Every structure is written in structure tokens, then in C-alpha cells.
UniProtKB/Swiss-Prot annotation:
Function as written in the Swiss-Prot or TrEMBL entry: Catalyzes the oxidation of 5,10-methylenetetrahydrofolate to 5,10-methenyltetrahydrofolate and then the hydrolysis of 5,10-methenyltetrahydrofolate to 10-formyltetrahydrofolate.
Higher taxonomy: Bacteria, Pseudomonadati, Thermodesulfobacteriota, Desulfuromonadia, Desulfuromonadales
Listed EC numbers: 1.5.1.5, 3.5.4.9
CDD domains referenced in this protein's UniProt entry, alphabetically: NAD_bind_m-THF_DH_Cyclohyd
GO cellular component, one term: cytosol
Pfam families for the chain: THF_DHG_CYH, THF_DHG_CYH_C
UniProt source species: Syntrophotalea carbinolica (strain DSM 2380 / NBRC 103641 / GraBd1)
Keywords for the protein's UniProt record, in alphabetical order: Amino-acid biosynthesis, Histidine biosynthesis, Hydrolase, Methionine biosynthesis, Multifunctional enzyme, NADP, One-carbon metabolism, Oxidoreductase, Purine biosynthesis
Reactions it catalyzes: (6R)-5,10-methylene-5,6,7,8-tetrahydrofolate + NADP(+) = (6R)-5,10-methenyltetrahydrofolate + NADPH; (6R)-5,10-methenyltetrahydrofolate + H2O = (6R)-10-formyltetrahydrofolate + H(+)
Name the UniProt record assigns to this protein: Bifunctional protein FolD
GO molecular function: methenyltetrahydrofolate cyclohydrolase activity; methylenetetrahydrofolate dehydrogenase (NADP+) activity
UniProt pathway: One-carbon metabolism; tetrahydrofolate interconversion
Residues the record lists as binding NADP(+): G165, R166, G167, S194, I235
Amino acid sequence: MSAQLLEGKVVAAAVLEDVARRVAVLKDKGISPGLGTILVGDDGPSVSYVNKKRETCKQVGIASFHNEIPASATQSDLLAAVRDFNDSPDVDAYIIQYPLPKGFDFNEALNLMLPEKDADGLHPVNLGRLVLQEPGPVPCTPAGIRAMLQHYDIAIEGKEVVVIGRGPTLGRPLSLLLTLKQPYANAAVTVVHSGIKDLGAYTRRADIVIAAAGCPGIVQPDMIRPGAVVISGGISWEGRKLLPDVDEAVGEVAGWITPRLGGVGPTTVAMLLLNTVQAAEERARRAGKL
């Protein structure tokens, strides 16, 4: 068996087409959506990711604002950058690129952010809204994974889903998202992690396995039921080499799988811009222009 590919680039293109259309509508009404980025230090993968976000903003017509802070700066400098974007009328939403260098407190900066300007959907208020099924920005990688399953019309309701990873940016919010009583959710979700000795005892019974651990090769072929859906959401870096959570040979067992490149990453960026245009639409509604 050779698995069919879940092409994140295809899913992202469809999302970005919708974003570009909505941006054009807003601009016709005098509203120009803007996305801000706070980057601390010069970590290679972070710089590449931020550059990709900027390129995609340009593609769909979203203005891009940047605040680059040297790693030698202080926590006070980071908090000042957050306040600047909070106060800026041109920035509808923004991100604090994670991870931060040692010595910086991400949670303190995140809590200072205005929840309505949280492009990543990670502010405690917005995670609470996700729990309560209230409107708000959804964390981008979980939202992108759900959009991918929806795009390929892969049934989730009532299915057994195993999420490997419990981090605040992917594993935990994804497990919440997939248990909501909504279309393309309402699944039976089990959350496991790298501290469990026999992960295969959980994954072999799953219809869908989503790896979000950031542990290279944590998912091996003998851990997957033939025909299952396998999504690699967690990554690690060895220098500039990307190492996915899912071993390449899993593609010989799975029914569907994300490719090594062009899987979840493009959908994450697309959902970031979707959150941004939704924030701009809310600004337009407050101004009576939408």
C-alpha cells in the first residue's frame, strides 16, 4: 500500500483564495488589514517562518508590520513591542514568534497582548473561548489540520483519534478542537505523549493519528493500523534540516499521510492570515462599515 497525500499546499491555496477575496471587500470599504510580527533574535527556522508569513501577506494583500528585537534585548523591550502593536490602529492582529531566546518570558508577553489582536489564537482568553465554543481566533496549526481533513472529506465524527503531544500550541488545543460538537469534529480523542512507554498500544487502534510531539520518528510503521490517516504536525530541527515526527516508511502502511514537505506548514500560515482578516472584519463591523 502507498498512502494518498494530504497536500497542505492545496488546502492553503483554497484558504488564501478566500482570504484574498475578503481582503478586497474590506479595502473597498476603506479597511486595510494588517498583521504584525514580533521576532526576538535570529533563530534560523524562526526567521524563515516569519519571512514566509510576510511573503504570504503580500500575496493576499494584507499589510505586514515587523518589530525585530535583538536577542541581547530585555523582557521590558519585548513588552514594549507588545504595547506598540496593541496601540497601533494599523495592526489588526499580530504574533510573538515562538520559541523565544533564553531569558524571555513568552507567557508574560502573551498575557499582555489584547485578545482580539491574537493572530495565533493562543491567548488564555481565546483558549477559553475554544473550550466554551465561543467565537474567537483558533490556534493556527490545529485549525489548519482540521481544514485539511475537511478539504479531503475525511470523516472525523465518531472516529478514534490519537494525538501524540500535549503542548499548548498544538496537542492540547487540537484535542479540544476535534471534540467540539461540530462538523468535522465530534471525535473520540485520546491524548498521549512521549513519556508513555508503548505508544503503539494506543495508535494501532486509531482511525486518525496526529503526531504533535516534536520528537523525530516517534511514529513508526508498526504503530499504525493499515489504512489509517496519519498527520505529522510536530517537527524538530537538526541545524537547518527539518525532522518530522512521522517516519517516512509509515506511508507504506497508512491510507492517507502528510508529505515530508508541504504538509501542515502551509495550512498553519494560511490560518494565521484567516485569523487576521477575521480581526479586520471585526474592526470594520465596529466602525459600521461591514
